[in-house]
């Protein structure tokens, strides 16, 4: 008898993928994320991915969290040359000077944004009007590298001092944090993500303490 995991159809990873990639596809990718700090952390990681595969970043994610103080923007904004030097000697992360410098700069841009404009998550979600876009793609060939929305997000972030936030990075970010549902229709997660994106049902007024009959 086949186990339930083997019967699931996935879009961009298969049953033979390493456990971290399977778990990321099945539990994280495309789940709507709204927290300001969580979105900032994901944006930083996606910046480190530039030119690399997500598998590389995922395998280093735990060390990234340790090395960058759990992506706490207040701490990151205070990183000095000594701390940056330590990061560039850490084999557990991506040791790219421009990307490390951009992560620190982005922490400062994030804090400046919070002070001037408020909620970072609310701002990012405006590029899909606050509601996840439910795409209906049947092939990986249909997935775009960038869209008008990711172009607009990139422009807005660059204008506010963020770096390593090009349109392609922004679209990968939008896919990952559930702003768009890009699981293929044939993937078991498409319907699950769609249900997660639905607004909660309104509470019924005036009925208390009555169970099913």
Spans of features found by a protein language model:
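Glycine-biased, low-complexity coil/linker segments
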Residues: 203-210
């Amino acid at each position: 008898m086949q186990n339930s995991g083997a019967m699931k159809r996935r879009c961009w990873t298969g049953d033979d993928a390493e456990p971290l990639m399977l778990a990321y596809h099945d539990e994280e990718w495309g789940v709507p994320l709204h927290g300001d700090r969580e979105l900032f952390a994901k944006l930083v990681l996606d910046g480190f991915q530039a030119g690399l595969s997500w598998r590389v970043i995922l395998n280093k994610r735990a060390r990234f969290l340790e090395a960058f103080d759990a992506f706490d923007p207040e701490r990151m904004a205070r990183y000095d040359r000594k701390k940056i030097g330590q990061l560039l000697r850490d084999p557990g992360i991506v040791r790219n000077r421009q990307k490390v410098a951009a992560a620190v700069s982005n922490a400062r841009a994030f804090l400046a944004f919070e002070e001037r404009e408020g909620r970072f998550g609310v701002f990012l979600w405006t590029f899909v009007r606050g509601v996840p876009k439910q795409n209906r793609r049947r092939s990986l060939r249909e997935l775009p590298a960038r869209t008008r929305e990711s172009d607009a997000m990139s422009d807005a972030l660059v204008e506010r001092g963020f770096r390593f936030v090009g349109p392609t990075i922004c679209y990968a970010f939008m896919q990952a944090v559930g702003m768009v549902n890009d699981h293929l229709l044939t993937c078991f997660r498409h319907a699950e993500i769609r249900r997660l994106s639905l607004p909660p049902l309104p509470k019924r007024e005036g009925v208390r303490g009555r169970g099913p009959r």
